Amino acid sequence: MSVLAEILDGVRADLAAREQQTPLADLKQRVERVPDPRDALTVFRNSPVSVIAEVKRSSPSKGKLAAIADPAALALDYEAGGAAAISVLTEGRRFGGSLADLDAVRRAVDVPLLRKDFIVSPYQVFEARAHGADLVLLIVAALDQPRLVGLRERIESLGMTALVEVHDEAELGRALDADARLIGINARDLRTLEVDRATFARLAPMVPPGVITVAESGVRGPHDLLAYAAAGADAVLVGEAAVTGDPRQTVADLVAAGAHPAARVGR
């Protein structure tokens, strides 16, 4: 069984437990009470190369990365460093995240928030909105085409934005067929967990104008941001480098690089 398949099995089991605990009707009522979502697409379009900083305790490829006892404090550091948006892992078994982390971060910061998880059900989309998310990750490799389209439509019906993640040409084609407006190109191979930054450079030219492109994985510092920007990135997502170093300074350095004229070469 692949790493992705194992993760999805756990996600479905945990989802079933939450559905028993909190009925969908209750979630929908909570959605009606939360403030309207932030317009993340406008934030990305009005920025130079945007930085999405991630609250990430662990990963299947690296194991434990950081304890992160106070995700709100980490998010405040990210916001102070200039992050355009913050990604919050909510998958618990492999990434050590939770919806409580999303709640804590939402209370602390004003920038758009991405719920980063393995979304397979509309229930999770309503969860994301109920807990304050403005964006929701959809991983093409985890979904068949009807489910991908349906979830993207549900996300947008609640005023949020879908970040549709791809890893190869076929997945990019599916994302575009699903009318994705925000596409994340992940340089990490889901089968081997290895990072190949050339993946972004290969796929980005196939993304049509008007679709915002996010480079995911392999962002260690400003040189990586500039390389991704030269290949056409509108934004980068940074996780490991931010949580294992000085979070505020790491983000600030990336933001400064993204604002540099050199970052506009490929855009």
Curated annotation (Swiss-Prot):
It comes from the Bacteria. Keywords: Amino-acid biosynthesis, Aromatic amino acid biosynthesis, Decarboxylase, Lyase, Tryptophan biosynthesis. GO terms for biological process: L-tryptophan biosynthetic process. PROSITE patterns: IGPS. It catalyses: 1-(2-carboxyphenylamino)-1-deoxy-D-ribulose 5-phosphate + H(+) = (1S,2R)-1-C-(indol-3-yl)glycerol 3-phosphate + CO2 + H2O. One of its GO terms (molecular function) is phosphoribosylanthranilate isomerase activity. Pathway: Amino-acid biosynthesis; L-tryptophan biosynthesis; L-tryptophan from chorismate: step 4/5. The keyword Lyase applies. Its EC number is 4.1.1.48. CDD domains: IGPS. InterPro entries: Aldolase_TIM, Indole-3-glycerol_P_synth, Indole-3-glycerol_P_synth_dom, Indole-3-GlycerolPSynthase_CS, RibuloseP-bd_barrel. HAMAP family: IGPS_B (MF_00134_B). Belongs to the TrpC family. NCBIfam families: PRK00278.1-1 (NF001369), PRK00278.2-4 (NF001377). This is Indole-3-glycerol phosphate synthase.
